């Protein structure tokens, strides 16, 4: 084996030389080998070349044409090259799948081929010779501008030998595939999509104009990084002269997709000397309480919440204490007369108003892949004398960096839990009958939540409240109130990860039903940060359960729970950004005929970001944009706003209603909700899902009514419908005792087609009456 091709390659590498396996020599190999061993289509580009002490030989191993090359074991030795006496036998197995090589320069091997065929196939050059060639090349042509002018002025084409022609094509092929060259070309506004075309034109120009000396010097260096770095300055001169229109076009695109230095987007905030107070600590450490105290003391203030539910809770609490406070969320606007304080969701933050104190809750959400941009915008753009940040330590370092960039003063206040969270070593041993009063059992799927609820109520005397993300905020608040009330029989909570933030709950112990969840693609372990957030909900100062406990249902999950709680918070290195509409509008002007869905994708490819930021995911936006492409008459701004509507993109019914809303709006018609409503609570899982879906559609209508007020006039009717459905959902959860249905059964059990709202007037009167009673 060692005397065959693999042996020669191995000896060449062991002597620390570079190896070039050229396409031309593969042609020779084909011609000298029988057709039974080598297919006639063998002459295809198959090689790469790397200088230095590494070898890279690439073959398309999965291609039937290369079946003659087998994989084997080789024994390293050297009989022709001085290897400094290191001729010890080393047996090594060589793979064939990877296009890469490791730090030791592992070689893909060939076997069962006569060694004599390699005489003119393997060109071995020592590093010293390669270095001399590189030095000679750079010394002789040190000025790329001068070389380019010589090439441009040349009229006589040099006669190249066939081997030189092939070698030049190899070199330019390597240049075209160089990631370094493609990235550097962006600096002169040659985009990656146009880069191959530019290289092709440059290759033709160079081969036609270059002199024989330049060719020979380049061939000596070969398709290496040295050749790429030598050719690149000449390539730049060629592109600047040859493609001015393309460069100008791409520069305009890049300039409008520039998301670098986002702090400069808010000049009024930069003109202020802001004080940033970071309340850093775990759940149930009092950090948000202290920030809210400062919020209520201020002459005017803003509280920014990650959830509607939490914004509503602060709104109620502050008003109950006699401080007038308004509520702003995507779905509702409640302006309280004489109010100087506002509780809002973070997406509703206004960077135009001036505040004495602003509170940004759950600041670690800046790193959220979808919504992080809202926190980043608020932190950079709020015009407030004091901004209080509440969150865990994961984003502390990047907040320090952002404050250094903006010139804001940063004050850090660190907190610990009032009482440590205790892990119970004794789990529930897989038996839900072991739950106790005050327990919160956390499951990560809707099906599991209801299975747990029904099992507990069947085998124990406990009654369960239920909280999960698809429920309306009003229903979740009702379930939380039911659980916190000691005067009823509902003493166990079954919840999803939605329990991690947004509700004040009197939880004695958090029990994890499982520590795995479906991420939309596969089952994965729950992230440590999420485990800590949820487990930290146990125990609450001032409640009947001040001490927090946590454990798992199954013993096999306990070690992972302990590991997650002991693990420090991961340090965040980047936070989210997303362009404003004005930036999208400028970008669209550069590509006027592009569909909006493609526009967003194009923007994502060309936008420039600082190292501290990432572009937030916009899969949801793109899917809605694709659906709305068929709707004519929408302006760019209309499409932008419709795409951010809170729609469940996995729910065809919700998507259909969004399409219908957009179609009516595009025709300048009043947008109505053509939806009936059940008169009683759900009797099955299918009916419960139907109620959830209906409420989501109504919520979407209310959100759109705040974007397009004139065209969504039936707000009062929709609010009444939404309130009614939220109450029906609460009743349904209290009575839920049905068997969970499969997806097939759910399809069969779909509700009848909507035939319009059945009783709007009476329902509106009822809702008004209830509001009046509450005011009294």
From Swiss-Prot:
GO cellular component terms attached to this protein's record: mitochondrial nucleoid; nucleus
The Helicase ATP-binding domain, residue ranges: 268-426
Enzyme's top EC category: hydrolase
Catalytic activity: ATP + H2O = ADP + phosphate + H(+)
Entry keyword set: ATP-binding, Helicase, Hydrolase, Mitochondrion, Mitochondrion nucleoid, Nucleotide-binding, Nucleus, RNA-binding, Transit peptide
Entry GO MF terms: ATP binding; ATP hydrolysis activity; RNA binding; RNA helicase activity
Major location category of this protein: nucleus
Biased composition (Acidic residues): 85-101
Matches recorded under Pfam families: DExH18_N (PF23703), DEXQc_Suv3 (PF22527), Helicase_C (PF00271), SUV3_C (PF12513), Suv3_C_1 (PF18147)
PANTHER family: ATP-DEPENDENT RNA AND DNA HELICASE, DEXH-BOX ATP-DEPENDENT RNA HELICASE DEXH18, MITOCHONDRIAL
Protein name, entry field: DExH-box ATP-dependent RNA helicase DExH18, mitochondrial
Organism for this UniProt entry: Arabidopsis thaliana
């Amino acid at each position: 084996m060692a005397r065959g091709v693999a042996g020669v390659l191995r000896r060449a590498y062991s002597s620390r030389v570079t190896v070039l396996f050229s396409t031309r020599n593969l042609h020779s190999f084909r011609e000298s080998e029988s057709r039974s061993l080598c297919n006639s289509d063998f002459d295809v580009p198959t090689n790469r070349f790397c200088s230095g002490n590494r070898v890279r030989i690439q073959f398309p191993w999965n291609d039937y044409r290369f079946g003659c090359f087998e994989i084997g074991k080789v024994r390293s030795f050297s009989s022709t090259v001085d290897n400094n006496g290191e001729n010890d036998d080393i047996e090594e197995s060589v793979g064939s799948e990877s296009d890469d090589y490791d730090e030791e320069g592992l070689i893909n091997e060939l076997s069962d081929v006569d060694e004599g065929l390699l005489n003119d196939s393997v060109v071995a050059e020592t590093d010293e010779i390669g270095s001399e060639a590189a030095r000679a090349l750079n010394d002789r042509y040190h000025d790329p501008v001068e070389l380019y002018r010589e090439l441009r002025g040349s009229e006589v084409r040099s006669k190249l030998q066939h081997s030189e022609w092939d070698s030049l094509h190899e070199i330019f092929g390597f240049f075209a595939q160089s990631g370094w060259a493609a990235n550097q070309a962006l600096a002169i506004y040659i985009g990656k999509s146009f880069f191959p075309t530019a290289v092709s034109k440059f290759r033709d120009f160079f081969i036609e104009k270059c002199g024989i000396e330049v060719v020979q010097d380049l061939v000596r260096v070969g398709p290496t990084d040295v050749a790429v770095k030598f050719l690149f300055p000449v390539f730049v001169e060629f592109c600047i002269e040859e493609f001015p229109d393309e460069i100008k076009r791409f520069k305009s695109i890049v300039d409008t997709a520039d998301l670098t230095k986002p702090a400069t987007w808010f000049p009024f905030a930069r003109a202020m000397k802001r004080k940033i107070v970071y309340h850093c600590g775990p759940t149930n450490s009092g950090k948000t309480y202290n920030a809210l105290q400062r919020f209520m003391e201020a002459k005017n203030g803003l509280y920014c919440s990650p959830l509607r539910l939490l914004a509503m809770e602060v709104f109620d609490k502050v008003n109950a204490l006699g401080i007038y406070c308004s509520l702003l969320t995507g779905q509702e606007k409640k302006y309280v007369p004489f109010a100087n304080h506002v509780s809002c969701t973070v997406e509703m933050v206004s960077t135009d108003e001036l505040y004495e104190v602003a509170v940004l809750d759950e600041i670690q959400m800046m790193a959220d892949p979808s919504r992080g941009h809202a926190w980043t915008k608020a932190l950079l753009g709020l015009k407030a004398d004091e901004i209080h940040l509440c969150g865990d330590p994961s984003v502390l370092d990047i907040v320090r960096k952002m404050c250094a960039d903006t010139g804001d003063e940063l004050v850090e206040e660190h907190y610990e839990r009032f009482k440590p969270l205790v892990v119970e070593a004794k789990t529930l041993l897989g038996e839900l009958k072991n739950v106790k009063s005050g327990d919160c059992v956390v499951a990560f799927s809707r099906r599991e939540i209801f299975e747990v609820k029904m099992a507990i109520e069947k085998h124990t005397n406990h009654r369960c409240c239920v909280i999960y993300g698809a429920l309306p905020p009003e229903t979740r608040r009702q379930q939380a109130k039911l659980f916190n009330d000691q005067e009823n029989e509902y003493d166990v909570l079954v919840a999803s990860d939605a329990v991690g933030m947004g509700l004040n709950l009197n939880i004695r112990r958090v029990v994890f039903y499982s520590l795995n969840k479906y991420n939309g693609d596969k089952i994965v372990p729950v992230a440590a940060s999420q485990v800590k957030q949820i487990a930290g909900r146990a125990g609450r100062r001032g409640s009947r359960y001040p001490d927090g406990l946590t454990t798992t249902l199954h013993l096999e999950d306990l070690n992972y729970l302990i590991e997650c709680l002991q693990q420090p918070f991961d340090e965040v290195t980047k936070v989210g950004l997303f362009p404003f509409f004005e930036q999208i509008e400028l970008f669209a002007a550069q590509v006027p005929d592009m569909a909006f869905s493609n526009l967003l994708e194009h923007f994502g490819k060309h936008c420039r970001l600082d190292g501290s930021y990432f572009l937030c995911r916009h899969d949801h936006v793109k899917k809605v944009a694709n659906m709305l492409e068929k709707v004519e008459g929408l302006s760019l701004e209309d499409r932008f706003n419709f795409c951010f509507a809170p729609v469940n993109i996995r729910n065809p019914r919700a998507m259909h209603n969004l399409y219908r809303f957009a179609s009516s709006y595009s025709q300048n018609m009043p947008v109505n909700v053509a939806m009936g409503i059940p008169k009683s609570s759900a009797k099955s899982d299918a009916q419960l899902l139907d109620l959830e879906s209906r409420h989501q559609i109504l919520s979407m209508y209310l959100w759109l009514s705040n974007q397009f007020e004139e065209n969504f006039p039936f707000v009062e009717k929709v609010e009444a419908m939404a309130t009614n459905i939220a109450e029906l959902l609460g009743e349904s959860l209290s009575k839920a005792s049905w068997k969970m249905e499969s997806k097939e059964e759910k399809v069969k059990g779909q509700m009848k087609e909507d035939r319009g709202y059945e009783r709007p007037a009476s329902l509106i009167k009822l809702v008004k009456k209830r509001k009046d009673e509450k005011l009294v």
